Amino acid sequence: REEYPDRIMNTFSVVPSPKVSDTVVEPYNATLSVHQLVENTDETYCIDNEALYDICFRTLKLTTPTYGDLNHLVSATMSGVTTCLRFPGQLNADLRKLAVNMVPFPRLHFFMPGFAPLTSRGSQQYRALTVPELTQQMFDAKNMMAACDPRHGRYLTVAAIFRGRMSMKEVDEQMLNVQNKNSSYFVEWIPNNVKTAVCDIPPRGLKMSATFIGNSTAIQELFKRISEQFTAMFRRKAFLHWYTGEGMDEMEFTEAESNMNDLVSEYQQYQDATAEEEGEFDEEEEGDEEAA
């Protein structure tokens, strides 16, 4: 960060899940990581093993998903996010543009990615999808790569990246359509908070696809889940000696925990915010930052 202050720091961070757990101390590692990510990155795509598993089970009907299958989903999403950098398109967006459009408050830069159409590794889709189908699938909770239900929160901002040959007019109509039908799920104090980019070149094996990036307050569910697991272990100081033995301090854990809980309450605060109260919020925010 010191060396390259003007670079956009972008991470794809895998959030642990109890369903597919390699190590017992995942909640510790995740919490300590979030503590760093909140301060040091510009955009973080939260990819959740739990959600990836659910997608493999439910949507792709895989009975025993391997890491290969999970990675297939992750790579589809990552490729979608960086499409605009790599290919020519009508409406191009780079990472900086994404960051500018997606992050209304510097700490709240944890996005849930989604992808449509979801295909398993072997079977590429045989039928061409229409733009309405893509849009509908893209906003579907089952397609989110983070195990949170967007219906439990509100979108601060959304970016959609469509790939393939399609009519721009249709894309715009569909995106407006989604916003009008579900207006309660988009915060009203950020107008036009859905950005669309279209790129001509679809991913291999598909005619068209869409990548979804949502900055939703529902992502707090994910942090709450980790926080609960963290607290359960930290209360009893379980496994702490592995960390303290490496020269870490218990204080760091406490700080990381409270930082993550602050993040959750910040998301909640903006979820409940309405346009009228906006003035009050600005003052509170400034006070908070000075205190921090």
From Swiss-Prot:
GO biological process: microtubule-based process
Binding site for GTP: N49, N71
Compartments in which it is found: Cytoplasm, Cytoskeleton
Keywords of the record: Cytoplasm, Cytoskeleton, GTP-binding, Microtubule, Nucleotide-binding
MF terms in GO: GTP binding; GTPase activity; structural constituent of cytoskeleton
Alphabetized InterPro entries for the sequence: Beta_tubulin, Tub_FtsZ_C, Tubulin, Tubulin/FtsZ-like_C, Tubulin/FtsZ_2-layer-sand-dom, Tubulin/FtsZ_GTPase_sf, Tubulin_C, Tubulin_FtsZ_GTPase
SMART domains: Tubulin_C
Disulfide bridges in this chain: none
UniProt cofactor(s): Mg(2+)
Keyword Hydrolase: no
Region of interest called Disordered, as start-end residue ranges on this chain: 265-292
Keyword ATP-binding among UniProt keywords: no
CDD domains: beta_tubulin
Acidic residues bias spans: 274-292
Superkingdom of the source species: Eukaryota
GO cellular component: cytoplasm; microtubule
PANTHER family listed in its UniProt record: TUBULIN
Family named by the database record: Belongs to the tubulin family.
Subunit structure and binding partners: Dimer of alpha and beta chains. A typical microtubule is a hollow water-filled tube with an outer diameter of 25 nm and an inner diameter of 15 nM. Alpha-beta heterodimers associate head-to-tail to form protofilaments running lengthwise along the microtubule wall with the beta-tubulin subunit facing the microtubule plus end conferring a structural polarity. Microtubules usually have 13 protofilaments but different protofilament numbers can be found in some organisms and specialized cells.
Task of the protein: Tubulin is the major constituent of microtubules, a cylinder consisting of laterally associated linear protofilaments composed of alpha- and beta-tubulin heterodimers. Microtubules grow by the addition of GTP-tubulin dimers to the microtubule end, where a stabilizing cap forms. Below the cap, tubulin dimers are in GDP-bound state, owing to GTPase activity of alpha-tubulin.
Protein's name in the database: Tubulin beta chain
Species of provenance: Strongylocentrotus purpuratus
